[in-house]
Amino acid sequence: MKNRKFIEIIGLLSVVGSLIFVGLEINQNTTAVRGATQQAVSSQVAEMYRIGAENERMANLVSKAFQDISKTDISESDYVSLWMYQMMGFRRIENIYLQYKNGLLTKDAFSRIGMGIYRTKIVREIWDERRGDFEPDFVEFFEELRDN
């Protein structure tokens, strides 16, 4: 009888120890996933900066956007180029939003976006044309983020 209780206590301690180990492993894995997510977001930003740095035309278009131009102020091909570039930006913010909703990023991730370009006249025009390509929850979130 004493041996049985001793074996049960050993078994219980083994189960508790295993659960603690699993909990620690899950925590470590979550930390690794968050780190990888933050790295992916940083890579997206770096790619956008690289395009602007290496492509004089794109750098010029971004500069013009900050001069409050609208779609009618540039050629159709320039507009399409800026549209594609800004869609990268919108998708980057959408990715941050989805990772935030999934608990992989904190709300402070949005403070590092650099919302200035998204408040310009031409980028608002692009957004108005393309907002239907995004989930309604994200549209509402993005517009509140952009406008505040």
Report the location of each language-model feature.
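An amphipathic alpha-helical interaction surface
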Residues: 78-148
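Extracytoplasmic/periplasmic/luminal assembly and interaction segments
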Residues: 54-94
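Membrane-proximal alpha-helical anchors
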Residues: 1-71
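Short, flexible coil/linker segments at or flanking structured domains
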Residues: 3-4, 9-14, 29, 33-36, ...
